[in-house]
């Protein structure tokens, strides 16, 4: 088995997944890890073009991200996936694919729908609340919170840097990255 692993950031739109991932990644690189990012929007654009937002299409999108992450993990990469991935069963499938080659670290980025709506610069929540967008996760489509993620980051009242520190500390505890030596 390689020394690769996957961090799977899951949470509502606007919870802070990508923001925190973009802080964690450079820290992993600083500690000698080769990092690859699979952002949900980029995966949808490049690997899942043409898919909609039905449950089946969302599952297909996440399974594709999981397959790519498993291959990168097999090659020793530190893979950071940031995707809403709303359904527990599909996250479990991704976990199974990835754990064949290395650890899967589920990182639940937790924020209320209200907080996410306040952070929403695209106005998607407002449109979903008005019924202009159907099937919006957390509004009229479910988000199944993880039962036992390896990391839970409650972002309300924390800066993105403080949230990233929670993830880094847990990776140190799990032995996936060397502990930071402070003088």
Question: Which positions does each model-derived feature cover?
Answer:
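Hydrophobic anchor at the beta1->P-loop junction of P-loop NTPases
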Residues: 9
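Extreme N-terminal, non-catalytic leader segments
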Residues: 1-6
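Conserved beta-strand scaffold positions in the cores of enzyme catalytic domains, especially
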Residues: 37, 104-106, 150-152
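Conserved lysine of the Walker
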Residues: 17
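ATP-dependent NMP and nucleoside kinases share a basic, alpha-helical "lid"
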Residues: 46-52, 69-129, 135
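Conserved substrate/cofactor phosphate-moiety recognition/catalytic segment
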Residues: 22-70, 74
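Small-molecule kinase domains that catalyze NTP-dependent phosphoryl transfer to phosphate-bearing small molecules
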Residues: 110-166, 174-183
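The conserved Walker
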Residues: 13
């Amino acid at each position: 088995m390689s020394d690769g692993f996957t961090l799977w950031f899951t949470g509502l739109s606007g919870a802070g997944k990508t923001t925190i991932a973009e802080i964690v990644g450079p820290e992993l690189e600083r500690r000698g890890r080769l990092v690859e990012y699979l952002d949900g929007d980029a995966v949808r654009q490049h690997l899942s073009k043409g898919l909609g937002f039905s449950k089946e299409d969302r599952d297909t999108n996440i399974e594709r991200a999981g397959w790519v992450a498993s291959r990168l993990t097999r090659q020793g990469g530190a893979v950071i996936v940031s995707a809403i991935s709303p359904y527990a069963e599909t996250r479990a499938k991704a976990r199974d694919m990835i754990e064949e080659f290395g650890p899967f670290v589920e990182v639940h980025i937790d924020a209320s729908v209200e907080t996410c709506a306040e952070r929403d610069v695209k106005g998607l929540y407002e449109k979903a609340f008005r019924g202009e967008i159907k099937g919006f996760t957390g509004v009229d489509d479910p988000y199944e919170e993880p039962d036992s993620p390896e990391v839970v980051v409650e972002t309300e009242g924390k800066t993105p840097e403080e949230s990233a520190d929670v993830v880094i500390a847990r990776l140190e505890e799990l032995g996936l990255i060397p502990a930071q030596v402070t003088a």
